[in-house]
């Protein structure tokens, strides 16, 4: 099942960052990647959490960034940037697709024209299946956008 992300989910979103980036993050809240969840609940923040019973196992969310502090997949100040992660034991069963599609619907209903993301080269196939296309390559990553 899915439900909207709320302020109480900020710790879970931080945990999901570790899965999204496929490498261990130190517990340093000043690392650049934590900008995706720091002070969750500001204007432009939205997301969905996948859960079964009391256990959450995945999340997809987006956040707007200012040009002065861009995210890794920054396009412009009007395009929210997507982050998505599912715990390893639940991957390959459609949870990511369900989360992503729900978030695309939410972004469209919130009036956004597109979403962006940053992916590693060779890790773009999932996003391409969900309307994302490559926009640019920089710093060893691929910036992708999906029109809504």
Feature names for model-found ranges:
Residues 107-119:
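Conserved GNAT acetyl-CoA-binding A-motif
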Residues 1-15:
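A short beta-loop-alpha structural element at the N-terminal edge
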Residues 24-53:
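Active-site rim helix/loop that mediates acceptor-substrate recognition in acyltransferases
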Residues 86, 92-105, 109, 128-129:
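Conserved acetyl-CoA-binding loop-helix of GNAT-fold acetyltransferases
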Residues 51-84, 91:
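Conserved acyl-donor/pantetheine-binding loop and adjacent beta-alpha core of acyl/acetyltransferases
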